[in-house]
C-alpha cells in the first residue's frame, strides 16, 4: 500500500474544510446551498460563488490523484457541482414565463428572482417585495456554466434546456441599458428600492456573453443543435458602456469594490489594461481598510449607526456612515486571485498574510472567514476622528460561504494544486493581452450589369449580386428576422430572440444555413425605413464610422467581411456615372487604408477562407414545421417592418431560389423578401403649370389648419414649411428662433370634420362642392396636374389627415381601382429622395411617421453613457426629459408629442439623436463636460449659427437648417459640439443639379477659438482672487480697436464682436461646464446652506446624501441650472460658481447661509458698467439685455484678463461674502 503524498494530505485538509464550511450545507434533493445557517434561502449569486471551491478541489484531486479513491473523490465533488448548477437551472426554468416577458419589457417585476427556497426551488418572496432584478447574478451563472462545461462537466442534458439557456442569453444581452439592483441588491445606495445602471452587472453580462458564444453545451458529446449563439454587437455595447463608466460603479456610487469581480477573476471583462489598473487603484486607495475593503463609500449595511428597524435610509442619513463603513475580507480573496492571474507574487503574499490576520479559528482549528468587520458602537466617535484606528469586531455570517469558497480556491491556486488555465479554460484571463491589427475585408458589388459597366470604366472590376452565387446576398433586416427563430421552443412557450436591429459586427460574417452560404449588407444601407441612406455623402460617412468600428471592436477569429453594394441611388442624377463621393471612397478602399482601418478589397469567394463563419443550425430541415407555422400570426405584427424589406439588387438569384425551390426555408425567405418594386401611380409633375394653392395659402397654412381640426390648436409660427423652388417671398415657415410658448386654448369639439372642410375650403380656396365643403374629387384631379412635388405632398397631406392613410385615390378614373394615400406618399418619398429634396423628404417622413431603425438604440447609447436627453423646443412643459431607455414606439410617440405635432421638428429630433449617438460612440471626449443634451435647444443653436453666418432672418435660417442634407446636418452638429470656431457659407451647386435644397459649406476658421483654460480664466485668476486689492481699475481696450498682430493679420474689434457671446450661448445651450465644476459646487455647499440660482435653491443637505463624484449629484446641480432659459446667462452663472469655488478653497469654515449667485453676477455687471461709464462709453455700449438686465457687452467680454468677466466676478464674489473672509488685507492660503 502506497503512503499518502504530502500533496494528497494537503488536499485532504482542504476537502475537510470544504465539507465543513460548504458541502455540509448542500441540500440533498435540489443541490442548492443556503446563504448561511441563519438564512435558509438560496441566492443565485452566492450559490455560484460558493461552489467554485468544490469545482476547483475536484479538478485538483483529478490532477493530483495518488490512488483510485482520489478519483472517486474528484467524481463526487464534480457531481456536487453539477447538482447545484442543475438545481439553479431548474429554479429559473420554473420561471420561464418571466424570461419570456422580460425580453420585451425589461421591467423589475418581470425578472427572474434573486433567491429561491433551498429545499423546493420555489420562490420565497413576491415580485415586488425584493430587488430581484440582478443581471450580474444570472450572468455569473451563465459565465461559470460555460467555464465548467468547457472543463468537461456535463450540466445541460437536453435541447429544451439548451433553448432555455439561449433565452437567458437574450435576457442578459440588454444589460447595458437595464437599470437593476446590482450585486448588493440595493440599487441606488440610498437603499430606497431605486434601480440604477451598475458597472458590475454590465461587466459580468459582457463576460458571460463572450464566454458562452459558440459554446456547445453538450461538450464533447454535442452537435450543432446544442451550440449557443450570441450577437457580437450586443457584447460590444456592454464593452462600450462599461469602459465609459469605470472606475465609477453607478450613478450613485463613484467606486465599488464589487468591480474587482469585473476587472479580474471571474469576469476579466475589461480589455484596457490601464483602465484595469486605475479601477483597482481607486478601490484600494478609497475603500481598503485593516480588515478588508468597504463595498462603497457611505455603505450603511451593519453599521453601528444603521437603524435596523427601517429597510430604507433617509437621504441625509448617509453622511453618518462615512468612515465607519463595514469592511469585508472577501475583497482580499479577489485580490489574491487577481495577483495569481497577474503573476504578481508580492500581491498574493501580501493579501494572504492579511487574510491570516482576520481569519477566525473554529472547531478543530477550521479556518473561517466572517462576512464583515464592524466598528464597536462605543468607539464610533473615535473612528470618525481617526479612520482605520479602531479595532473592529467580526459580525454577519460565519462562515460566509461565498468568501470561504474564494479563499479556498485562492489557496489551491497559490499552492500549485491548480493552474490558472484549469479554472479558466475559456482563457478569459488574456482579455488585456495584445491583439493584432484587424484587416477589414470589403467586397464591393454592383446592383446591375449597367452599374458594373460604369465601375469598369473607372478601372474597378466588381461582380454583380447575381454573379456571386452560390453565395447569397441579403439585407440586414432579413438577418434580424432570421434570428427571431433562435431559441424558439414551443414546449417552454419561448418565442426566441425579439426582433432587433443587427449591427455591423453581426453582418460582417458569413452564415451557413442549410448548406448554403449567406452574407448580409450593413443596416446603414437600408433606404426604405429612414432617409439617411438616401444621402450618398452620409453613406460614405457611415461607412467610415463602421469600418473604424470593425477595426477596433472585432474580436472573433478570422477577418470581418463587409459587403457594400453600389445601387442605382449612388449614381449621379442622370444615371450615367457613379456619384463622385462614392467613387473616391471606392478608390481609397482600393488603396488599402480608410478611416484609420486596414482594408482589403476583393471578391466574396476569395474572402470565404479568411472570414468568420457562423452555422445557424436552428434553421435546419427538422425545424421546418415550426418555421412557417407561426408566420400568419407574425405577419401582421411585423408587416410594417418587412413590407419594404428587400432592396432588389437586380437579378441576384435570390428571387430565383426563393420562388422556385420547395425548401421550406426558401419559402420562409420568400415571405420576408416580398418584392418592394413599386408600380408608379403618381402622374409626372406638370412643370410650368400654376400652383394648386394661392400664394398666400401654402403648406404653412395647411399644416396649421390640419392641426386645428385635430384639436391641437398649434400656433402657426411653430410649424415648418419645406423649401420649394418656387417659394414666394411672403411664404411663411418655421422660425426656430422665435417660438411662442405652448398655448392651452379650447380644443375644437363637435363636428370637427365638417367645420374643417368648410373652413379649409373657404380659407385656402380649395375646390368646393355644392354644399360648400371640400370637393375631394376635384382635389384628386388637381393632384394629377401639380407643377411640383411640394404641391403633391400638400394635397396628399390634406387627404391623409382628412380621409386617412387607407383612403383610396382613383387616379386612373372611376372604376379603375384606387391607390391608398399611404402608398402614394411612399412613392412620393422615393421621388423626393431621388431629387435630394431634403426638406420635402423630412416633411413626408413626418407624415408617414417614419422612425429611425436604430432610434431606441441611439437613445440607449446616450443614456447609458450617463447623459440625459430632452426633446422638444424649450421651455418646459413642452421640453420633455428622457432619463431611462424607452421602447421604440413609446420613444417615437414622446418625440412627436414634445414637438407639438410639428412633424418636421419631430423627424429632425430623431435624426440629431442618431448623430449624437454616433459621436458618443466614436468621440466620447466631445461630451466630457455635458450631462444633459437638450436636442430642441441644439436645433435652435444650429439655426442661430446659420442665421449669423449667412446673415439671414430666423425664418430663412430655419428653412435652411431643415433643408440641409443629412451629411451637412451631422457636420454642423459636430462643429457645435466640438467648440471650435467655424464658418458657414453658401456654395454653388453643379449646373446639372436639379436639387433645390441650399448648398452650404461648413469650414473651420482655424485656431482662433480660446482653449478651455482661456474660457474659464481659472489659472490666471487663481492667484488674483486670493488678494483683495482695493486699488482703482483702469479699463483696457475693450472698446478700442485691436492693434496689428505679429503674424496673423489685423483683426479689428468689430470683427471680433459677438465672439464670446456666441461661445457662451453655445456652451450654455449644450450644457457644457468646466472640468471639475460639480466638485466645486459640492465644496461650496459644504461651507454654506445652499446656492440660489435664478430663484431655485440647491440645498447643502445634498452633500450629506451624495459624494462629490456621484453622477446623481451632477444631475441635481443640472436640474437647478436648467431652469435658466437663456443659455448665455446660464453660462455666466456657471462662471460665477467657479469663482465661488475658488473662494471656498480659502481656509474658512463658512462663507454664508444661502448664497444668491444671481446677485453676485449682477454686482459684477454693475462694476463693469461703472468702469465703462468712467471711460465715457456711449449708450450703445451700455445697452442691457431686457430679460436679464446684464449688459450685452459684458456677455461678450472674454473671461480672462484684468478686465475680463472673471475679474469682475471675483471682485463681486469677494464683496458679497467679505464678512466671512479673514480680516487681513490679503487672503493667503
Curated annotation (Swiss-Prot):
> What job does this protein perform?
Phosphorylase b kinase catalyzes the phosphorylation of serine in certain substrates, including troponin I. The alpha chain may bind calmodulin.
UniProt-listed Gene3D superfamilies: 1.50.10.10
Any GO molecular function: calmodulin binding
List the biased-composition ranges (Acidic residues): 625-646
UniProt subcellular location: Cell membrane
What gene is this protein a product of? Answer: phka2
Q: Where is the composition biased (Polar residues)?
A: 1028-1037
> Superkingdom, according to UniProt?
Eukaryota
Q: Where is the lipid attached (S-farnesyl cysteine)?
A: 1226
Name of the featured protein: Phosphorylase b kinase regulatory subunit alpha, liver isoform
Which GO BP terms sit in this record? Answer: glycogen metabolic process
Cite the residue spans of the region called Calmodulin-binding. Answer: 825-855, 1052-1092
Annotated control of activity: By phosphorylation of various serine residues and by calcium.
> PANTHER family recorded for this chain?
PHOSPHORYLASE B KINASE REGULATORY SUBUNIT, PHOSPHORYLASE B KINASE REGULATORY SUBUNIT ALPHA, LIVER ISOFORM
GO-annotated cellular components: phosphorylase kinase complex; plasma membrane
Q: Name one Pfam family in it.
A: Glyco_hydro_15
Q: Which family does it belong to?
A: Belongs to the phosphorylase b kinase regulatory chain family.
Residue ranges, annotated region (Disordered) = 625-648, 1024-1050
Alphabetically ordered keywords of this record: Calmodulin-binding, Carbohydrate metabolism, Cell membrane, Glycogen metabolism, Lipoprotein, Membrane, Phosphoprotein, Prenylation
Q: Does the entry feature the keyword Lipoprotein, yes or no?
A: yes
InterPro entries (alphabetical): 6-hairpin_glycosidase_sf, 6hp_glycosidase-like_sf, GH15-like, KPBA/B_C, PHK_A/B_su
Q: How does it sit in the membrane?
A: Lipid-anchor
Amino acid at each position: 500500500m502506497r503512503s499518502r503524498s504530502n500533496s494528497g494530505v494537503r488536499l485532504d485538509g482542504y476537502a475537510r474544510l470544504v465539507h465543513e464550511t460548504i458541502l455540509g450545507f448542500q441540500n440533498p434533493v435540489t443541490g442548492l446551498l443556503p446563504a448561511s445557517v441563519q438564512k435558509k434561502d438560496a441566492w443565485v449569486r452566492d450559490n455560484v460563488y460558493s461552489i467554485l471551491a468544490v469545482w476547483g478541489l475536484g479538478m485538483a484531486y483529478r490532477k493530483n490523484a495518488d490512488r483510485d479513491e482520489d478519483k472517486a473523490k474528484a467524481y463526487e465533488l464534480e457531481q456536487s457541482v453539477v447538482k447545484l448548477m442543475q438545481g439553479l437551472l431548474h429554479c429559473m426554468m420554473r420561471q420561464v414565463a418571466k424570461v419570456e416577458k422580460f425580453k420585451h419589457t425589461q421591467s423589475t417585476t418581470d425578472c427572474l428572482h434573486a433567491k429561491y427556497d433551498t429545499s423546493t426551488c420555489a420562490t420565497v418572496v413576491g415580485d415586488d417585495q425584493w430587488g430581484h432584478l440582478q443581471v450580474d447574478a444570472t450572468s455569473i451563472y451563465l459565465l461559470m456554466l460555460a467555464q465548467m462545461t468547457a472543463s468537461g462537466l456535463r450540466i445541460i442534458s437536453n435541447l429544451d434546456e439548451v433553448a432555455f439557456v439561449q433565452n437567458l442569453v437574450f435576457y442578459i444581452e440588454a444589460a447595458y441599458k437595464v437599470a437593476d439592483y446590482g450585486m448588493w441588491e440595493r440599487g441606488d445606495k440610498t437603499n430606497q428600492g431605486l434601480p440604477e445602471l451598475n458597472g458590475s452587472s454590465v461587466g459580468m453580462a459582457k463576460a458571460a456573453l463572450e464566454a458562452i458564444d459558440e459554446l456547445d453545451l453538450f461538450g464533447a458529446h454535442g452537435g450543432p443543435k446544442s451550440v449557443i449563439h450570441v450577437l457580437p454587437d450586443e457584447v460590444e455595447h456592454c464593452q462600450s458602456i462599461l469602459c465609459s463608466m469605470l472606475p465609477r460603479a453607478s450613478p450613485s456610487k463613484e467606486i465599488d469594490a464589487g468591480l474587482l469581480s469585473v476587472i479580474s477573476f471571474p469576469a476579466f471583462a475589461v480589455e484596457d489594461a490601464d483602465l484595469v489598473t486605475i479601477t483597482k487603484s481607486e478601490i484600494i486607495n478609497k475603500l481598503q481598510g485593516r480588515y478588508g475593503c468597504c463595498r462603497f463609500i457611505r455603505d450603511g449595511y451593519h453599521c453601528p449607526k444603521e437603524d435596523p428597524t427601517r429597510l430604507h435610509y433617509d437621504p441625509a442619513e448617509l453622511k453618518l456612515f462615512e468612515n465607519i463603513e463595514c469592511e469585508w475580507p472577501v475583497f482580499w480573496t479577489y485580490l489574491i486571485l487577481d495577483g495569481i492571474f497577474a503573476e504578481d507574487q508580492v500581491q498574493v503574499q501580501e493579501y494572504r498574510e492579511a487574510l491570516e490576520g482576520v481569519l477566525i479559528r473554529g472547531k478543530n482549528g477550521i479556518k473561517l472567514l466572517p462576512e464583515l468587520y464592524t466598528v464597536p458602537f462605543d468607539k464610533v466617535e473615535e473612528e470618525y476622528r481617526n479612520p482605520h484606528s479602531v479595532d473592529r469586531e467580526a459580525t454577519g455570517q460565519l462562515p460566509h460561504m461565498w468568501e470561504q469558497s474564494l479563499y479556498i480556491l485562492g489557496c489551491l491556486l497559490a499552492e500549485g494544486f491548480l493552474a490558472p488555465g484549469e479554472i479558466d479554460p475559456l482563457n478569459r484571463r488574456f482579455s488585456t493581452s495584445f491583439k493584432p491589427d484587424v484587416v477589414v475585408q470589403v467586397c464591393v458589388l454592383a446592383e446591375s450589369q449597367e452599374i458594373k459597366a460604369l465601375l469598369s470604366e473607372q478601372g474597378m472590376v466588381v461582380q454583380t449580386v447575381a454573379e456571386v452565387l452560390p453565395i447569397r446576398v441579403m439585407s440586414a433586416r432579413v438577418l434580424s428576422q432570421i434570428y427571431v427563430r433562435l431559441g424558439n421552443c414551443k414546449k417552454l412557450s419561448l418565442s426566441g430572440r425579439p426582433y432587433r436591429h443587427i449591427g455591423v459586427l453581426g453582418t460582417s460574417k458569413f452564415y451557413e444555413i442549410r448548406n448554403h452560404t449567406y452574407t448580409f449588407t450593413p443596416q446603414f444601407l437600408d433606404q426604405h425605413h429612414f432617409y439617411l441612406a438616401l444621402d450618398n455623402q452620409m453613406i460614405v460617412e457611415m461607412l467610415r464610422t463602421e469600418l473604424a468600428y470593425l477595426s477596433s471592436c472585432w474580436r472573433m477569429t478570422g477577418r470581418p467581411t463587409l459587403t457594400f453594394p453600389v445601387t442605382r441611388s449612388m449614381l449621379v442624377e442622370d444615371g450615367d456615372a457613379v456619384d463622385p463621393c462614392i467613387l473616391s471612397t471606392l478608390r481609397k478602399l482600393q488603396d488599402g487604408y480608410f478611416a484609420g482601418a486596414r482594408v482589403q478589397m476583393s471578391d466574396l469567394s476569395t474572402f470565404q477562407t479568411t472570414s468568420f463563419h457562423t452555422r445557424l443550425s436552428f434553421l435546419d430541415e427538422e425545424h421546418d414545421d415550426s418555421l412557417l407555422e407561426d408566420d400568419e400570426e407574425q405577419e401582421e405584427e411585423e408587416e410594417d417592418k418587412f413590407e419594404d424589406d428587400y432592396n432588389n439588387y437586380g437579378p441576384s438569384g435570390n428571387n430565383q431560389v426563393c420562388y422556385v425551390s420547395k425548401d421550406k426555408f426558401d419559402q420562409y425567405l420568400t415571405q420576408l423578401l416580398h418584392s418592394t418594386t413599386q408600380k408608379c401611380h403618381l402622374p409626372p409633375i406638370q412643370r410650368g403649370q400654376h400652383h394648386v394653392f394661392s400664394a398666400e395659402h401654402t403648406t404653412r397654412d395647411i399644416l396649421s389648419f390640419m392641426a386645428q381640426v385635430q384639436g391641437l390648436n398649434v400656433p402657426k409660427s411653430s410649424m415648418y414649411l419645406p423649401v420649394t423652388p418656387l417659394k414666394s417671398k411672403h411664404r411663411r415657415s418655421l422660425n426656430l428662433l422665435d417660438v411662442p410658448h405652448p398655448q392651452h386654448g379650447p380644443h375644437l369639439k363637435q363636428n370637427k370634420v365638417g367645420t374643417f372642410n368648410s373652413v379649409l375650403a373657404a380659407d385656402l380656396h380649395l375646390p368646393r362642392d355644392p354644399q360648400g365643403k371640400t370637393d375631394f374629387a376635384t382635389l384628386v384631379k388637381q393632384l394629377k396636374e401639380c407643377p411640383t412635388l411640394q404641391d403633391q405632398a400638400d394635397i396628399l397631406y390634406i387627404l391623409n389627415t382628412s380621409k386617412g392613410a387607407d383612403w383610396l385615390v382613383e387616379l386612373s378614373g372611376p372604376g379603375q381601382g384606387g391607390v391608398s394615400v399611404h402608398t402614394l406618399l411612399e412613392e412620393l418619398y422615393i421621388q423626393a429622395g431621388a431629387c435630394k429634396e431634403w426638406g420635402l423628404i423630412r416633411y413626408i417622413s413626418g407624415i408617414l411617421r417614419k422612425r429611425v431603425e436604430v432610434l431606441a438604440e441611439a437613445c440607449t447609447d446616450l443614456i447609458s453613457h450617463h447623459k440625459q436627453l430632452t426633446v422638444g423646443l424649450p421651455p418646459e412643459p413642452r421640453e420633455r426629459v428622457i432619463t431611462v431607455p424607452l421602447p421604440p414606439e413609446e420613444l417615437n410617440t414622446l418625440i412627436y408629442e414634445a414637438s407639438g405635432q410639428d412633424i418636421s421638428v419631430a423627424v429632425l429630433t430623431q435624426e440629431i439623436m442618431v448623430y449624437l449617438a454616433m459621436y458618443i460612440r466614436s468621440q466620447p471626449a466631445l461630451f466630457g463636460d455635458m450631462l444633459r443634451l437638450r436636442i430642441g435647444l441644439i436645433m435652435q443653436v444650429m439655426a442661430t449659427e446659420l442665421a449669423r453666418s449667412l446673415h439671414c432672418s430666423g425664418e430663412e435660417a430655419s428653412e435652411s437648417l431643415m433643408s440641409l442634407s443629412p451629411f451637412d446636418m451631422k457636420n454642423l452638429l459636430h462643429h457645435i459640439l466640438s467648440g471650435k470656431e467655424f464658418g458657414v457659407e453658401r456654395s454653388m451647386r453643379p449646373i446639372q443639379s436639379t436639387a433645390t435644397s441650399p448648398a452650404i459649406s461648413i469650414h473651420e476658421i482655424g485656431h482662433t477659438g480660446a482653449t478651455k483654460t482661456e474660457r474659464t480664466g481659472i489659472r490666471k485668476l487663481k492667484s488674483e482672487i486670493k488678494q483683495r486689492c482695493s486699488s482703482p481699475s483702469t479699463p483696457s481696450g475693450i472698446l478700442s480697436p485691436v492693434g496689428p498682430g505679429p503674424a496673423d493679420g489685423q483683426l479689428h474689434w468689430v470683427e471680433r464682436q459677438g465672439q464670446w457671446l456666441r461661445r457662451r450661448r453655445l456652451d450654455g445651450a449644450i450644457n457644457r461646464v468646466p472640468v471639475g465644476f460639480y466638485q466645486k459646487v459640492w465644496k461650496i455647499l459644504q461651507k454654506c446652506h445652499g446656492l440660489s440660482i435664478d430663484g431655485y435653491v440647491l440645498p447643502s443637505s445634498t452633500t450629506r446624501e451624495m459624494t462629490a463624484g456621484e453622477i446623481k449629484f451632477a444631475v441635481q446641480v443640472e436640474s437647478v441650472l436648467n431652469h435658466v432659459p437663456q443659455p448665455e446667462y446660464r453660462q455666466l452663472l456657471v462662471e460665477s460658481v467657479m469663482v465661488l469655488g475658488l473662494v471656498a478653497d480659502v481656509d474658512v469654515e463658512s462663507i454664508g447661509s444661502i448664497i444668491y449667485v444671481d446677485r453676485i453676477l449682477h454686482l459684477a455687471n454693475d462694476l463693469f458698467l461703472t468702469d465703462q461709464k468712467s471711460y465715457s462709453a456711449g449708450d450703445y455700449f451700455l445697452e442691457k439685455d431686457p430679460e436679464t438686465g446684464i449688459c450685452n457687452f459684458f456677455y461678450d467680454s472674454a473671461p480672462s484678463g484684468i478686465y475680463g468677466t472673471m475679474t469682475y466676478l471675483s471682485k463681486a464674489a469677494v464683496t458679497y461674502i467679505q464678512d466671512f473672509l479673514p480680516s487681513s488685507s490679503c487672503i493667503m492660503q
